[in-house]
Amino acid sequence: MENNAYPTLPLKNTVLFPHLVLPLSVGRAGSIAAVEAALSSEDKLIAVFPQKDPRTDEPAADDLFRFGTVGIIKKMVRSEDTVQILVQGIERVEQLEMVQKQPYLSLKIATLSEPSDTGTEIEALHRTVIELAGKMIELVQPQIQVGIHHIISDVEKPLHQIYLLTSILSLDFDKEKELLAAATQVEALQLMHRYLNHEVQVLEVRQKITSTAQTEIDKKQREYVLRQQLEAIQEELGETNPEQAEIKELRQRMEETELPELVRKEVEKEITRLERMPSAAPDYQLTRGYVELALELPWNKTTEDRLDLKRAREILDEDHFDLEDVKERIIEHLAVMKLNPEAKSPILCFVGPPGVGKTSVGQSMARALGRKFERMSLGGLHDESELRGHRRTYIGAMPGRIIRAIRRTGYQNPLLMLDEIDKLGRDFRGDPAAALLEILDPAQNAEFHDNYLDLPFDLSKIFFVTTANTLDTIPRPLLDRMEILRLPGYSDEEKQHIARRYLIGRQIREAGLSEIQLSIPDETLSYLIRRYTREAGVRELERMLGRIARKVATQVATGQTQPVTVTPQDLVELLGPERFFAEEMRQQLAPGVAAGLAWTEAGGDVLYVEAALLPEGKGMTLTGQLGSIMQESAKAAQSYLWSRAEELNIDQKTIRESGVHIHVPAGAIPKDGPSAGVTMASALTSAYAHQPVRSDTAMTGEITLSGLVLPVGGIKEKVLAAHRSGIQRIILPKENEKDLREIPEHVRQSIQFILARRIEEVLAEAIPDLNR
């Protein structure tokens, strides 16, 4: 066999060892040709070499491992595309050179003499390897240990025993090649010793894990059998009681509920306490309530979000008129969730006057997302424990509102609305706003600890939405965690649209009427809005429509069959006298009176500032519950006018000899803020110059001592209030020009906007006759 050329069979992922029989499936055309060539030879010998890279499809000599095995083909079976052969290894060989590559690979090879080294080291290694092999077989299949031991013992040479062990030891391809290349028996025994030692260690660890798991299973089975026997004995003795049945039910629920491991251990501990506790014990009901809470909380139960943007937009448009900024932000979040399911939900804060739809927008969001909705009012909340829960050591302890809300929804990812967050209180019992910092912070709320539950609960999947009428009372750290979305008030035309699309039909249905029985024309609706409601939202408007519907329902119930069409004249009979007249602008203003625009929690308002000169008086008197900022604005306006008296055509003698009294009507309502500065300056100038301010003009803006007009907030609400009052001209700071884009188009068209940088420009527009 020395230096002869043989048909060569490359192997992708296995090795043929001498004296072992290996079944092979041959599918490559070159390999099949090599098999056929070997079978056609007299000795049926074939050289078998493992490939260096199994991914090589047509290997040459350089692609094969240096060492291989010459084998004899014992059997061959043909199938459609492959050839199945049985090859017995004879001896190790080394490739010398390639003779041919086509039609099959043929290599010239050299036979490697079988190592015959001996000595005490080889004997010691050999015995250790045989012991490790026996231990491995015992760990895997003890029942075949004796049979395998006899098979190995029948093989005389240690090297042949090592090759035999490869058939029962799962070695990877590289280790098999490493073993085939071993030049001495010592090297081969050392390699096999290392492989077997690693395998035995892995099997021992696996057996230990299996044994531990089995012990735990046996323990639980034993407990189960003993409990069943105990229940049977108690039943025979007639000693069963409702408490035991209750505990049994709790334990069964615990087994059936998917709980985190930490929670399961705590619940198991509490149920065990219940079993040992008399039902009359003070802690019994508290412990039972705790277990029920832990079992009812949705630890891993979530609803699947509906991320159909088109459908979500339809739902939002169906439920609410306008509010484009809010709707766009919601759709943006849905788009982000669709592209990145792991994205954290934002904490939205809807800010706006009452009745503009803040709470109902939250309900629509939940409907669009397919999530459960839960609302929680925080107005007047002053105890931190209301949010975090009370510790169970206290009598009457309860979980906090957050955990109770999640329990009611039954899901871990509801949309939770925290209403009236601007009306949180605080006292000696703690600051609820500080507790909300943890609840709303995505970096902390993944492991929220309720004092009652005392287990980490993940709040990060909740979509938090808050509402407020104003941001002034919200602590700054809490405000920083929220994204502000403003919902300003509605114009009269928008209110008509909302009433026509949503409110009228709802009130007619609630009164048990049909739309045929009651109709409200646009003229009547407009009159109702202007004369019977004065609000930024539509809550009072809906109440008025409800009163009309109930009056008509009363008529129908008493026998009237004719359909009712409500006219403006009918409103006095149905609703009583007109409620609002002041919203109409004053037809003529006396000198010293100017119309200003104010922002309130209920929306915008027209505020008249009155200034009167006091003969022989001194200084300035301010009335109308004015805050410190408004008082400072009045003083700044007066100082500016005194310094510019000659330019403004104001008699300096009048200034020296007269005091001034500034009053802002609605004295029962506290007022503050810088936006009345230009109004006070105009009223004072009008009083000093004895020239009236234009009655069709209202204004807003902060002033400085040098006469600059600075920007203010709440422009949309103020403009809508002016529009409701019939104001035709509005003077605004130049820097507020950007805010006019938020004003509805029909309102912008009906009002002339004058933008001013200095107070002189304001006075020129507000008091046309000032310098004449």
Swiss-Prot record:
Its main location: cytoplasm. It catalyses: Hydrolysis of proteins in presence of ATP. ATP-dependent serine protease that mediates the selective degradation of mutant and abnormal proteins as well as certain short-lived regulatory proteins. Required for cellular homeostasis and for survival from DNA damage and developmental changes induced by stress. Degrades polypeptides processively to yield small peptide fragments that are 5 to 10 amino acids long. Binds to DNA in a double-stranded, site-specific manner. It comes from Nitrosococcus oceani (strain ATCC 19707 / BCRC 17464 / JCM 30415 / NCIMB 11848 / C-107). NCBIfam families: lon. It holds the Pfam family AAA. The lineage of its organism: Bacteria, Pseudomonadati, Pseudomonadota, Gammaproteobacteria, Chromatiales. Induction: By heat shock. Belongs to the peptidase S16 family. GO terms for cellular component: cytoplasm. SUPFAM superfamilies: P-loop containing nucleoside triphosphate hydrolases, PUA domain-like, Ribosomal protein S5 domain 2-like. Its EC number is 3.4.21.53. SMART domains: AAA, LON. GO terms for biological process: cellular response to heat; protein quality control for misfolded or incompletely synthesized proteins. GO terms for molecular function: ATP binding; ATP hydrolysis activity; ATP-dependent peptidase activity; sequence-specific DNA binding; serine-type endopeptidase activity. The gene is lon. The keyword Nuclease does not apply. Residues 6-200 form the Lon N-terminal domain. This is Lon protease. The keyword Flavoprotein does not apply. Homohexamer. Organized in a ring with a central cavity. Residues 588-769 form the Lon proteolytic domain. ATP binds at G352, P353, P354, G355, V356, G357, K358, T359. The active site is at S675, K718.
